[in-house]
Amino acid sequence: LWIDPKNPQRMIEGNDGGACVSFNGGASWASIYNQKTAQFYRLDVDNQHPYRVYGTQQDNTSISVPSASEWGAITLGDCSYPGTGESGFIAVHPQDPNIVYCGAIGSSPGGAGALQRYDHRTRQIRLVNVWPEESTGIAPKDMKYRFAWTFPLVFAPSDPKTLYAGGNRVFRSTDEGASWTAISPDLSLND
């Protein structure tokens, strides 16, 4: 929190989602959503022209920004939000740029370790979690599968229908996240 030494009514509060400004001593604050601030975790692009840039943000949603707009300047209205919560890895389907997978943490539906599939055509998000278990409050030793805050997510370069996700094991899906198979042993040294 910064308080202007010459005018204590002017304050700036910074957080990992952005910054909020008050001109009345904290009675009201400007939103973080009207300022160009963000902390990005990961970026990706799709293969269309014009292309879209995707980013996952700390304490905000993920965002998809087009590289061009019909009207010149790219506005917030041109953007879309392919994932919710505090997001980690993001992967755009290599053959269908309308399909985006986003690892989401925190306020995501499904809780910690959620994996979401977004369709630009319908603007709908569907949960495609690797393992349907809420991890909040469970000791790691009691969990069958464990995922980090931002777990890896990538399409196979040799097969665009194969998606991999990393937890204490590597998982593979060949049906758009409808089902997952563990394909590695426990990689965590039994933590």
PLM region spans:
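Beta-propeller blade termini and top-face loops
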Residues: 1-191
